[in-house]
Structure formats: structure tokens, C-alpha cells
């Protein structure tokens, strides 16, 4: 006692908080010093002390103890600001959806993490005795993230599929959640409750399986005599010191350790804390230690390979059941992992990248050649360095050197000024850690309907060559050009009869109808894409009008382009300049097969001028087409008037339209008849008024197509023979039949006084026929009824125009009947007769009676983008006709530039070219663009581009141009300018299509500087207009759009746009036609413009843009759909495939452990392992040559996979704050990796192919038979491993009892009863502890005889030298692959 008192005086006084870890340390040191019994007394006193203090504290918890962190407000605000900027960038097309999602998640994750770190200091400063603070940081159950949710913010949540919801929960539980936040957080809560119930049972089951695998592993020897080890290296800072110490303490060295010439530790010495400290301070060579992996036995383990027992700190005793301890050590924390999930409920955890920050202000410099530009995963521009990059930062007085590791992103440019603590580089997270990653597909859907373009080449994936899946080779934009497609508000009707040839694409379009029940005249819009065309077309002949069905689709649109062009139709268009026929599909010459034709015919006058109410285009509806001859009769809808008035019905609603056109709104009737016309001399084989059947011979080579009554009329020089089909009735005397042409009788009217009373289902035509004077009979003929729809005024359908106050162009659809009433129609053989023609009539300014505009100029315009040519039909309304104000030869009339330098002065010198006049002329040039053609052979289609899809932008600052041209001319005084700046009045319809080309003329002295394009020498020669497309080519469009121009005898030169680069210092952006412009791009001086789109019209002071939405896509993305295809809202546009780290599963720990142990997670383990091991094997093959390389490769594969598995399992537990010693995991992993699968070839006499055998057993058998066994390393899950042991009794007691016992009986298996479980089942003594001695006596004689063969040892030594002592080689090629940041850096095993 006195001794104790004396010692107490010398004791050190510790004044610090003792938490869980400190208690552990204290206890282990007490055991070391005082032994077990004494320690338990001390701990008893500590327990009493603790309870007394806790009672005295009487801690309580109220809601007021939860203090919100003050800095939260501005942190959240800052994060919101960042997401807003991000949203904008996404809208402008600078980042794509995946990058946006990633970045917003990281922004919020960082915010939430920062709040979490603020929490502890905040409590410590404001209220250190706050019960929440005391409890949460005392080491009691629970963790910081729960407190963080109470007082910080809940942050990001996962949805049930484990995907991130990118809407964070900004409130904490103390402030209360909003409704949305509550619903989002319910995902996690529900999952937490369910998981707690499910996982508790799972954890128990996990323990059971683990114990099953390793129950037979007992310490049976002191030393197995192995010479292998696993090397652990403290150097290069790859492994944190804490983990390094944990790995080494309690292990046994496999090799002597030298420090220079001096040996500081010998083989088989166990490592204590002192030795570890020496290793750390000296930083010696890698330390080779013995682990359960290196032990040479199959079914047991030796003391030295196991190391110290964690219970008492000495080497493990013989006979200890280390297997069962290992299984329980891993399974037991599983229950804790489970319960943890409940509290955090689905809060997202994910790694963010590490940043390198600048140490001080200054200029940054690095070698440009070592980096290449790239995109970060957030879509920011950055430089990627492939090797170590040395960066210097020059501040005023000091140079800082920073080394940036390879594979990092450099976020600044060379010679850029950086501020202190600015992020200059981002180290890629996950170069060393093989964290669980998965590949995810994300689909991006189109937000609007329109036409798809892309701005780069697109590869076809080889397996999808014929489909619409394309891969992007480089980062580019996809554009959806706005424009609706044709939709009908009626239920789709089929235009096809059985076995018609039909146009495939038109049926596709019919699927997209929107059906609407209330149908009135405005909604009666059809989409007609069809054809009845069946005549043969010879290859060399141009298809003619009679054979092509001209269609204009009656849609609610003011802009359409159907078509496909090819050589034939081009010729056709050129031949009839004033008409433009657009076949929807052309004849494919290669296949020599007939394709159906249908098209819209657009008719323009030769001079390009349309008057009011003139027909712009027409369409022959195939439903109003007849093959046979007949008579047209008009009717009204009033049924009674037909019966009462036996005479003709009065005309209604006929409007004289273009002399020949009569518009009818009522139904009209077509009475078919067969007509044959013969020359006078021919002999007719039937009599007048006789009845004939079908297919009767009429003349020599003619047969009748229908049966009925024959009428023969002889006219001058020809005979006309008609056959009327129908019934013949002989009326009674009371019937009065009109003596004139005939009566139409509506359906449902019964003629009772006919001989047979009969109700007619359809309209019939009753005609009186008088063969002789007294006798007559009545022919009742079938009638085909047609209803003509009312013309729709399309003006109401145009959206309000953005380009001017209102859209003053109107299109009306008018149907008119081509033939007059009662007119007989003669059809010539094999052609069809069009009864009704549908026209598109152009009108404007109907509201203003006194409008001055009488004519509109029309022209075709092509806009080409990336080889896809769209033709637009352009209609300009001209407010006033332009006439020359002076004579042509009067020089003062056209001299725009006079001697005076003042611009305003000479702008007014020419009234025609005066600037004000041009401005006025442009501003009064109101027009609508209509897209029309598409020179793309694949897809005929109709698109509507209304004026609301375009917008005008401007004005540009055009003042510079005058001066520059003037100055350039001053240098060369010989030039006499006749006409300078400004468009030519004569080509008015193209005034808007000169982009920045101004026509200027002069003597050809400066020809070298300008591009000479066109010489117009004769009068009335055609001037072509040229357009630039996106790639800067100049197009000469189709000749049908040329305009005849009464030009002067002048030389015209085009100014090439390079000219501007030479002369204009302050030039505006040169905008070419068809170019795509992103939102927020500065074009003119008055700031950025607000919409993105494609340039359609370039004018002197403004441009018109068709609005479009850009979507960014990165390489490897899959694009759905074809170039130029029409997409609808919600169609899939792009699919991105991206890797994301698996979001920490809501149940964080247990499922992961189970997945790893059951070797179930297919992606992560096997992918990474294969990648790593491929690399190894390559190198080894190079070093050792093929046969040895493969042999060692197999062993290395196993070793490598073992180490990787251990690290994975440890990572899961460490992330939960659970400490498990590596050796427990190693014992388990050793069991699941110790089996191999026998391959087909070789050794069939010992093992069956596909049999699972132990690795060591295979090696031994091979040595005994002096023959090699072919096998493949295999990872078994713990369930399979427990069903593949040497004891069938233990297998049967685990699972599938009947199956296992039956199999064992069939094979005649023997159970050697080596494990615990078999003996328990049978009731024998279990071979552990005291009961294991019996087994030892038998095997004593084999104790330490290593199996030796000279060859093998020689080989092992050599290989060891090559592999593991060639330091340079090792470090360069292999170590890079296997160092693992947070875990042990195991190196392959040493054989020395």
C-alpha cells in the first residue's frame, strides 16, 4: 500500500475529456501494466464514478437547446445564387443536363458539409454546456449527421431508386420543413423504418453465414514455415499513419528488417507499439508481415500467421477457435450499421474533388505543352495534365512552387493573375480509391416540337447503321428549330384502300393526330398525304402533271415544306418556271421500282408578282378524283327542295373567282357513266337502248366495263357510245317524270307508286328515257355524292407576329368545283378526272380597305445548313412601286459619293438610294416567310413555321461601312463609283438577303482585293443571288428562282467578306445565313440579344432569326432521330451515359458488406479487379515471358483480389466509425478466395472439369503427379463457400439438407470431422481448446519439413529477385496501379 502511495505522488495528472477511444486506450494500457484482475477493480470504480456524476448532472433536452447556426442564411443564399447561374448556362447551351445535375448536387453538398463543420465550433463558442453539444460529441450512440439535421440543414436526399433529387431540403428539423421538403424527406423516412426491420434479421443471417464459412479454422500449429509475406509500406504518404499503425500492431514479421547494415527486427518477431514507432521515424523499406493469407495450411492456421490475440495482447493460444471469433467480429457490428440508417434516413453522402488553392496573390505560370484543353465534369473549360505539372506563382517578393499531380484539371490559364486561396486545380477524386461507381443513362427530352439539327458530324454506331441511333464524336450542340408540325383535330381517316402502294412516312405522321369532338368549320383541317398514282413512268421521261398528284395540305399553318427533290423534279421545276411542283417522294432510279407520287403545286407568276386573291398553290384532293366519265350535278342540302322542284336546283354561293373557278359549299353529285368514242367508220356490235352485261364486246377491240343500258349517238365524224348502269323501272300512269334532264332523289324517299315499292338507301338519279314516242321507261342510276368543305380562312390561326404589329397576310383555303352544273365529263383512258380542286388563296390587309399595296413579290429562297437545304417561300408586300427617278445615263443620279466627306450630305444626293429611303423601304417591307422545300432525299415532311417562331434583331451600326469604302477609294482616285452602298432596287425581292454584301462597281483595277463573281453585260440578263451558309460557302440556288432584271450595262462586283477583315476595325459580327446563334451572344453594339436560333433573313440593319433551342451534348452521347427529322414535345433527344459514385445507400453499411462478401456487386469489384489485374499480367508477361508469366499471373490475381476485398470491407466499416481488425476480415476472405475451378483440359483423371477444389490441394496434386493442372481462380460468395466445404455434415446443417445428404451419399463422401459443427451435430468432442490435442499427436512428425524441390526453390528465388527487388521496375510499373489512398498499400508477396 505504501508503495502505491509513493507511486501516486509521481503519477501524471491528466486533465482532458475521456471519450470512448480514450477509455479503450486506458484499458489496454492498464491490462499491459497490471494484468486482468487488477484492471477489473479499477474499471468498477470508474463505473461508479460515472454513474454518480451523471446523476449529479441531471442532463435534460428541450427544443430551445437546438441552436441554428448563424451563418446558415448567407450560405444557402450563396448556393441558390450558384444554382441560378447554372440554370442560365444550361439554358444558353453551355452545359448539358448531366453536368448541371452534378454541379448543383456538389454545390448543395458542399454547403451542407460546411454547415456541419461549423456546428461544433459554434456550440463550443456560444454555449459549451448545451446538452445537445455534450451528448452529440460525447461518443455516445448517434453521430454528427443527426445533430446536423436538427440544427444545420437536411440537405440532399435520394429517391427510392437511389438517384439524387436535385432539390435540396434547405430547412432543418428545428425550423420545420415546408410541404415539398416534407414529401421529399418522406422517402428516406419510410425506407429507414422498413430497413430497420428487414436488416436486423439480415445482420443475424450474415453472422450465421460467416461463421458457417470459417467455423473449422482453429490455431493448430506454432509455425507453418511459410516464407511468404505481404509488404506494407509507410512511405510516400499514401496510407494514413493511423491505419498504418493499426495494420502493423499485433502482427508477426515475415522477414528481417535492416536499417542500413544494422538489423532492427528479426523474422517471426511480433510487432509492438515501440517497433511501429521506430518504423515510422526511420521510414525504412517496406515491411513484410505474415497474415492469414500467407499461411500454408488449408483447414487451420498457425500462431505466427495469426499474430497477437486482441483479448490479452499475447500471441494467440493453440487450439483457439479464431474462425468463429472472426465471423462474429464482422457480423456483430452489422446490427449497429443497420440501426444507424434509421436516423440519417436517406441523406446523400458523396465525395467531392480535392482542390489545390493558390498560396498567395500573383501571376501563375506553367508549361503549356504539357496540358491539353478539356471539359471538367461540370462543363467548365479546363486543362488536363497527364504527368506531374510544376506551377510557379510569382508574387511581388516571393516565388511559390506548386506541384499538381497527374490526371488533374487545371482551372486557370497560363500567365493569369490569381488571388490568394483561389482554386487553381482540381485533383480527380477516385484515381487511387476504387470507389463503387455505376454507369447511369440519363435521357434528355425535347421541350418543344420542331426540327432537329446538329452542328457536328455524328457517327453511326456500327450495330445501328440503319437505325436512328447516332454517337457523337465531339462536343456539340443539338438544335431543335421551332415550328409545329401538321396536326389534325379530327380522328385520322385512312386514305388507303387495300393493296395500295403508299408513302410510308405519311402514315407515320398520321399517328400524331389530336382528336377533338367538337368539329366546326374552323377545325375541319385535314392532313392529306396520299396517292392513287399508278401509271407506269418510263425511266427517261419526266413525270408530268397528270401523273403526279398535287397536294397542298389543308393545315392550320402558314408555312410548310413537304419534299424531296431529285433530278427528275428539278428538271420539272426548271421547265415550268412559273410553277413549282414538289413531289413528296421521287422515283428511285437505282431500284427501278415505282414509288407513289404526291405533291403540292405552288404556282408563281413568271414575274414573281402576286395580286390580291390570287392562287398561291393548289392541291388536287385524291378523294375527288374519278377514273370514269360522268356528269356533275349540283345539289343543296335542303332535301325537300329536290323532290318538289323537279327542275334544276338554283346555284348557291358561287363566287366568280378566277373566271373558271366556282366555289361551292353544298354537296354535289357525280353520276358515273361509261363513254366510248369510235370513229365514224367503225362497226358497233350492240343496239341502241339495249341492255348489256359486264364485259360485253362492243366494238372490235373494246369490251364494256360495266353493264347497263346502251345509248348510241352519232355526231359528226364520230360515234359516241354511253353505257348507263342502273335499274330500269316502267312507271305507272300516275308518275310524272320531268321531261328534262332528270331528277336527284335523296335517300329515304319511297316511291310507292312504282311497281315495286322500294326505299332507296343512297341518292339516286332518275332519268326518263323515251325509245319510242308513246313508250318510255325510267332509268334509276347510282350517284356518287361528294361534300365540299367550306373554305377555311387561315388568317385566324396565325399567332400574332413578332416582326410587326400584326400578321397582315391571310391564306384562305378555297374548294371549287372544276366543272359546271350538268356538264358531261369525258375521261380519256387511264387518266383520272379531278372534280374539285383545293386552292390556297393569298390575301392581305383585308381590314384596311384603302390599302395601297396591290401586289406582293414572291420568290424562293434556300437556306443551307450543313448540307441540308431548306427552301423557303418568301412573300414580300411592297408598299410602293419603285421607279427610277432619273434617267439611266444621268451621272448625278447615281453618284452616291460626291467630293464632300460628309456622309449625310451625299446620302441625300440620290433620292432612290438615299439612306432614309432605304430605311423606309425596309421598314415597310412587310413579309412572312414560309418554309417550303427540303432537298433531303430521306424525309418528306411538313413543318409550320409561324411568325411567332421568328424574331427580328437589330439595328446594326452601319455607319462604319460608308467611311471605309470611301477611304479605300480615296487611295485610288481613278475609280469612279456609280452605285455604292445599298441594295439594288431592281432586285427588290431579295433586298433582305444580301447579308453584308454590298454591290459596288468600279473599273477593274482593284480586282485582286475583291472577289469577282458575276458580269452582267447584256440587258435583261438574269442576276443570280448568292447566299452564304454556315460554312462560308456561297451558294447559287436553283435557277427557277432567278429574277429577270432590266439592269444596266455595268460590271457588278461582289465584295467578299474577307474584305471586311482587312479594312474594318470596328466591325459587327458577320452573320451568315443559316448560322446558329446561341442566346446571350453579343452581335450588335447594343448588347446581347435575348433568344437563340437560326438566322433566316439578314437585312441591312437587322436580322430575322428562327427561334431554336440548343442542347449541349458531349462525346459518347447517343442522339436519337435523324438530321432534319421532326421531333415532338417530350420525344427523347439524347441519352448521356455517365459514371456516378453510388450514392451512399440509405442503408449505408450492411448491404454493402453483404454484397462484397457474396461477391454480388457485378460492376464495381469485377470491373476494377479485371482492370487492375490486366495491367499486372501485361507487365509480368513482359518481364518473365509467356509461360511463367501466366503461372505467376494466376497467383497474383488471387492475392490482388484478396487485398482488394479486405480494403473494400474495411472501407464500409470505417465509414461507419466501426473498428475491426484486418485479420478477422482476412480469415473470411481467405476462405472465399481459396477455391479454384478446374478447366476442361488436362488432369481429367483426378478432377472433373468444373469441379471446385482448394487452391493448395490443386498445387499439391500437381506436384504429386508432376503434371500441371489447368484451373481458373474464382471468387465464391460466403453462401457458396459454406456449401462447398470438406464436410458434408456441416453443409447439410446449413441449407438444403436433403440435397446435400443425397449428393454425399451418391458420391460416397467421407467426413473427417475436422470442424466444430460436424462434431457438435454428432456429439463428439469439438477440436478446439483442450479438445484439440488429440489431433496434434498424429501430425507431429510432419511438423517443420518444408516440401522442397530444387527446381522450385531456384525458380522462386530468381523470380523473387526479378519481381520484388528490382526497385525501379517495381515502382514505375506496378506500384502505381495498386496503391490505395486510404487503405493499406499491400505489395505482392515476397518470396525470398
Swiss-Prot record:
Q: Where in the cell is it found?
A: Plastid, Chloroplast
Keywords (A to Z) from UniProt = Chloroplast, DNA-directed RNA polymerase, Metal-binding, Nucleotidyltransferase, Plastid, Transcription, Transferase, Zinc
Q: Give the EC class as a word.
A: transferase
Which cofactor is recorded for it? Zn(2+)
Which CDD domains does the annotation name? RNAP_beta'_C
Residues binding Zn(2+) are 224, 295, 302, 305
Presence of the UniProt keyword Transcription in the record = yes
SUPFAM superfamilies according to UniProt: beta and beta-prime subunits of DNA dependent RNA-polymerase
User: Gene Ontology terms, cellular component aspect?
Assistant: chloroplast; DNA-directed RNA polymerase complex; mitochondrion
Q: Which GO terms describe its molecular function?
A: DNA binding; DNA-directed RNA polymerase activity; zinc ion binding
How the cofactor is bound: the record states: Binds 1 Zn(2+) ion per subunit.
One GO BP annotation is: DNA-templated transcription
What's the Enzyme Commission number for this chain? 2.7.7.6
So what does this thing catalyse? RNA(n) + a ribonucleoside 5'-triphosphate = RNA(n+1) + diphosphate
Q: How does this protein assemble?
A: In plastids the minimal PEP RNA polymerase catalytic core is composed of four subunits: alpha, beta, beta', and beta''. When a (nuclear-encoded) sigma factor is associated with the core the holoenzyme is formed, which can initiate transcription.
Summarizing the function annotation, the protein's role is: DNA-dependent RNA polymerase catalyzes the transcription of DNA into RNA using the four ribonucleoside triphosphates as substrates.
Q: Which family does it belong to?
A: Belongs to the RNA polymerase beta' chain family. RpoC2 subfamily.
Sorted alphabetically, which NCBIfam families does this protein's record hold?
Answer: rpoC2_cyan
Name it: DNA-directed RNA polymerase subunit beta''
Originating gene: rpoC2
Amino acid at each position: 500500500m505504501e508503495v502505491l502511495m509513493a507511486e501516486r505522488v509521481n503519477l501524471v495528472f491528466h486533465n482532458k475529456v475521456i471519450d470512448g477511444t480514450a477509455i479503450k486506450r486506458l484499458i489496454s494500457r492498464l491490462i499491459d501494466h497490471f494484468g486482468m484482475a487488477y484492471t477489473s477493480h479499477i474499471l468498477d470504480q470508474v463505473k461508479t464514478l460515472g454513474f454518480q456524476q451523471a446523476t449529479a448532472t441531471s442532463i435534460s433536452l428541450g427544443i430551445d437547446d437546438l441552436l441554428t447556426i448563424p451563418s446558415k442564411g448567407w450560405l444557402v443564399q450563396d448556393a441558390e445564387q450558384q444554382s441560378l447561374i447554372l440554370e442560365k448556362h444550361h439554358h444558353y447551351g453551355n452545359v448539358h443536363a448531366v453536368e448541371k445535375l452534378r454541379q448543383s448536387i456538389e454545390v448543395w453538398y458542399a454547403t451542407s458539409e460546411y454547415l456541419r463543420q461549423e456546428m461544433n465550433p459554434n456550440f463550443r463558442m456560444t454555449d459549451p454546456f448545451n446538452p445537445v453539444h455534450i451528448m452529440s460529441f460525447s461518443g455516445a450512440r448517434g453521430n454528427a449527421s443527426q445533430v446536423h439535421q436538427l440544427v444545420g440543414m437536411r440537405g440532399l436526399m435520394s429517391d427510392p431508386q437511389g438517384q439524387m433529387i436535385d432539390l435540396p431540403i434547405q430547412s432543418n428539423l428545428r425550423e420545420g420543413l415546408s410541404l415539398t421538403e416534407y414529401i421529399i424527406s418522406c422517402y428516406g423516412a419510410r425506407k429507414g423504418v422498413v430497413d430497420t426491420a428487414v436488416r436486423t434479421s439480415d445482420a443475424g443471417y450474415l453472422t450465421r453465414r460467416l461463421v458457417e464459412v470459417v467455423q473449422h479454422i482453429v490455431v493448430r500449429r506454432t509455425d507453418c514455415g511459410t516464407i511468404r509475406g505481404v509488404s506494407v509500406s509507410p512511405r510516400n504518404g499514401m496510407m494514413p499513419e493511423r491505419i498504418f499503425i493499426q495494420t502493423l500492431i499485433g502482427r508477426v514479421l515475415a522477414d528481417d528488417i535492416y536499417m542500413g547494415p544494422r538489423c532492427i527486427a528479426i523474422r517471426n518477431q511480433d510487432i509492438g507499439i515501440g517497433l511501429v514507432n521506430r518504423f515510422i521515424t526511420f521510414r525504412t523499406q517496406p515491411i513484410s508481415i505474415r497474415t492469414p493469407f500467407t499461411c500454408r495450411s488449408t483447414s487451420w492456421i498457425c500462431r505466427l500467421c495469426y499474430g497477437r490475440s486482441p483479448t490479452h495482447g499475447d500471441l494467440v493460444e493453440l487450439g483457439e477457435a479464431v474462425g468463429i471469433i472472426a465471423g462474429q467480429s464482422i457480423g456483430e457490428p452489422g446490427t449497429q450499421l443497420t440501426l444507424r440508417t434509421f436516423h440519417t434516413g436517406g441523406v446523400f453522402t458523396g465525395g467531392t474533388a480535392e482542390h489545390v488553392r493558390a498560396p498567395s496573390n500573383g501571376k501563375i505560370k506553367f508549361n503549356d505543352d504539357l496540358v491539353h484543353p478539356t471539359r471538367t465534369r461540370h462543363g467548365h473549360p479546363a486543362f488536363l495534365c497527364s504527368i506531374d505539372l510544376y506551377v510557379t506563382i510569382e508574387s511581388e517578393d516571393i516565388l511559390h512552387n506548386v506541384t499538381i499531380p497527374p490526371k488533374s484539371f487545371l482551372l486557370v490559364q497560363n500567365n493569369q493573375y490569381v488571388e490568394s486561396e483561389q482554386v487553381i486545380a482540381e485533383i480527380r477524386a477516385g484515381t487511387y480509391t476504387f470507389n463503387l461507381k455505376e454507369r447511369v443513362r440519363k435521357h434528355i427530352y425535347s421541350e418543344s416540337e420542331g426540327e432537329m439539327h446538329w452542328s457536328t458530324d455524328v457517327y453511326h454506331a456500327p450495330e445501328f447503321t440503319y437505325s436512328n441511333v447516332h454517337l457523337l464524336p465531339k462536343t456539340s450542340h443539338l438544335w431543335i428549330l421551332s415550328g409545329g408540325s401538321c396536326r389534325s383535330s379530327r380522328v385520322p381517316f385512312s386514305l388507303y384502300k387495300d393493296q395500295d402502294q403508299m408513302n410510308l412516312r405519311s402514315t407515320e405522321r398520321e399517328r400524331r393526330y389530336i382528336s377533338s369532338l367538337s368539329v366546326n368549320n374552323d377545325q375541319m383541317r385535314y392532313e392529306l398525304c396520299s396517292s392513287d398514282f399508278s401509271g407506269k413512268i418510263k425511266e427517261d421521261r419526266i413525270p408530268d402533271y397528270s401523273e403526279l398528284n398535287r397536294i397542298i395540305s389543308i393545315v392550320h399553318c402558314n408555312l410548310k415544306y413537304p419534299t424531296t427533290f431529285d433530278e427528275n423534279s428539278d428538271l420539272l421545276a426548271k421547265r415550268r418556271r412559273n410553277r413549282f411542283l414538289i413531289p413528296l417522294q421521287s422515283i428511285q432510279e437505282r431500284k427501278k421500282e415505282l414509288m407513289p407520287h404526291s405533291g403540292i403545286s405552288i404556282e408563281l407568276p413568271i414575274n414573281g408578282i402576286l395580286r390580291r386573291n390570287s392562287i398561291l398553290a393548289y392541291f388536287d384532293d385524291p378523294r375527288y378524283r374519278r377514273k370514269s366519265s360522268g356528269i356533275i350535278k349540283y345539289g343543296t342540302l335542303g332535301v325537300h327542295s329536290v323532290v318538289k322542284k323537279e327542275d334544276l336546283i338554283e346555284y348557291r354561293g358561287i363566287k366568280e373567282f378566277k373566271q373558271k373557278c366556282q366555289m361551292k359549299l353544298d354537296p354535289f353529285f357525280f353520276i358515273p357513266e361509261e363513254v366510248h368514242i369510235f370513229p365514224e367508220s367503225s362497226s358497233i356490235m350492240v343496239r341502241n337502248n339495249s341492255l348489256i352485261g359486264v364485259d360485253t364486246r362492243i366494238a372490235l377491240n373494246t369490251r364494256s366495263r360495266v353493264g347497263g343500258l346502251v345509248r348510241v349517238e352519232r355526231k359528226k365524224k364520230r360515234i359516241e357510245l354511253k353505257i348507263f348502269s342502273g335499274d330500269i323501272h316502267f312507271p305507272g300512269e300516275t308518275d310524272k317524270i320531268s321531261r328534262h334532264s332528270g331528277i336527284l332523289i335523296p335517300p329515304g324517299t319511297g316511291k310507292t307508286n312504282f311497281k315495286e315499292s322500294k326505299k332507296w338507301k343512297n341518292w339516286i338519279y332518275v332519268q326518263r328515257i323515251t325509245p319510242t314516242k308513246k313508250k318510255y321507261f325510267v332509268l334509276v342510276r347510282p350517284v356518287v355524292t361528294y361534300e365540299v368543305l367550306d373554305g377555311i380562312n387561315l388568317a385566324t390561326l396565325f399567332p400574332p407576329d413578332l416582326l410587326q404589329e400584326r400578321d397582315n397576310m391571310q391564306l384562305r383555303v378555297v374548294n371549287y368545283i372544276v366543272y359546271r352544273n350538268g356538264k358531261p365529263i369525258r375521261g380519256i383512258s387511264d387518266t383520272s378526272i379531278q372534280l374539285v380542286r383545293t386552292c390556297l388563296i393569298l390575301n392581305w390587309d383585308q381590314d384596311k380597305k384603302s390599302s395601297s399595296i396591290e401586289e406582293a413579290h414572291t420568290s424562293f429562297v434556300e437556306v443551307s445548313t450543313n448540307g441540308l437545304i431548306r427552301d423557303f417561300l418568301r412573300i414580300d408586300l411592297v408598299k410602293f412601286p419603285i421607279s427610277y427617278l432619273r434617267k439611266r445615263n444621268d451621272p448625278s443620279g447615281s453618284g452616291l459619293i460626291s467630293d464632300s466627306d460628309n456622309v449625310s450630305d451625299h446620302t441625300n444626293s440620290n433620292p432612290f438610294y438615299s439612306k432614309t429611303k432605304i430605311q423606309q423601304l425596309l421598314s415597310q417591307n412587310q413579309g412572312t416567310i414560309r418554309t417550303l422545300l427540303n432537298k433531303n432525299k430521306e424525309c418528306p415532311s411538313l413543318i409550320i413555321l409561324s411568325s411567332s417562331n421568328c424574331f427580328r434583331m437589330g439595328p446594326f451600326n452601319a455607319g462604319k461601312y460608308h467611311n471605309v469604302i470611301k477611304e479605300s477609294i480615296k487611295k485610288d482616285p481613278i475609280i469612279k463609283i456609280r452605285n455604292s452602298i445599298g441594295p439594288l432596287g431592281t432586285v427588290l425581292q431579295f433586298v433582305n438577303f444580301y447579308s453584308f454584301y454590298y454591290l459596288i462597281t468600279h473599273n477593274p483595277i482593284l480586282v485582286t482585293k475583291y472577289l469577282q463573281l458575276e458580269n452582267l453585260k447584256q440587258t435583261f440578263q438574269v442576276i443570280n443571288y448568292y447566299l452564304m451558309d454556315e460554312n462560308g460557302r456561297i451558294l447559287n440556288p436553283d435557277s427557277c428562282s432567278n429574277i429577270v432584271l432590266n439592269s444596266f450595262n455595268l460590271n457588278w462586283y461582289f465584295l467578299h467578306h474577307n474584305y471586311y477583315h482587312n479594312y474594318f476595325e470596328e466591325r459587327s459580327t458577320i452573320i451568315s445565313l443559316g448560322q446558329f446563334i446561341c442566346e446571350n451572344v453579343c452581335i450588335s453594339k447594343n448588347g446581347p440579344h435575348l433568344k437563340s436560333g437560326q438566322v433566316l433573313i439578314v437585312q441591312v440593319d437587322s436580322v430575322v432569326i428562327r427561334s431554336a433551342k440548343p442542347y449541349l451534348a458531349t462525346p459518347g452521347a447517343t442522339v436519337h432521330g435523324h438530321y432534319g427529322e421532326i421531333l415532338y414535345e417530350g420525344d427523347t433527344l439524347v441519352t448521356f451515359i455517365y459514371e456516378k459514385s453510388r450514392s451512399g445507400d440509405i442503408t449505408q453499411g450492411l448491404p454493402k458488406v453483404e454484397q462484397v462478401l457474396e461477391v454480388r456487386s457485378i460492376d464495381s469489384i469485377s470491373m476494377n479487379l479485371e482492370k487492375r489485374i490486366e495491367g499486372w499480367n501485361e507487365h509480368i508477361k513482359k518481364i518473365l515471358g509467356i509461360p511463367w508469366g501466366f503461372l505467376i499471373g494466376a497467383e497474383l490475381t488471387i492475392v490482388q483480389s484478396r487485398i482488394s476485398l479486405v480494403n473494400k470491407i474495411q472501407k464500409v466499416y470505417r465509414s461507419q466509425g466501426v473498428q475491426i481488425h484486418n485479420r478477422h476480415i482476412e480469415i473470411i476472405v481467405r476462405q472465399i478466395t481459396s477455391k479454384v475451378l478446374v478447366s476442361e483440359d488436362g488432369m481429367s483423371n483426378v478432377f472433373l472439369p468444373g469441379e471446385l477444389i482448394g487452391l493448395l490441394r490443386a498445387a499439391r496434386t500437381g506436384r504429386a503427379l508432376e503434371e500441371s493442372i489447368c484451373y481458373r481462380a474464382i471468387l465464391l460468395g460466403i453462401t457458396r463457400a459454406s456449401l462447398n466445404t470438406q464436410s458434408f455434415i456441416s453443409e447439410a446443417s446449413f441449407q438444403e439438407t436433403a440435397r446435400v445428404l443425397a449428393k454425399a451419399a451418391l458420391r460416397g463422401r467421407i467426413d473427417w470431422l475436422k470442424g466444430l459443427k460436424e462434431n457438435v451435430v454428432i456429439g463428439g468432442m469439438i477440436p478446439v481448446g483442450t479438445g484439440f490435442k488429440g489431433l496434434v499427436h498424429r501430425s507431429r512428425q510432419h511438423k517443420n519439413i518444408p516440401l522442397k524441390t530444387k527446381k522450385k526453390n531456384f525458380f522462386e528465388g530468381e523470380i523473387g529477385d526479378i519481381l520484388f527487388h528490382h526497385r525501379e521496375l517495381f515502382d514505375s510499373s506496378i506500384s502505381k496501379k495498386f496503391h490505395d489512398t486510404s487503405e493499406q498499400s499491400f505489395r505482392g508477396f515476397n518470396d525470398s
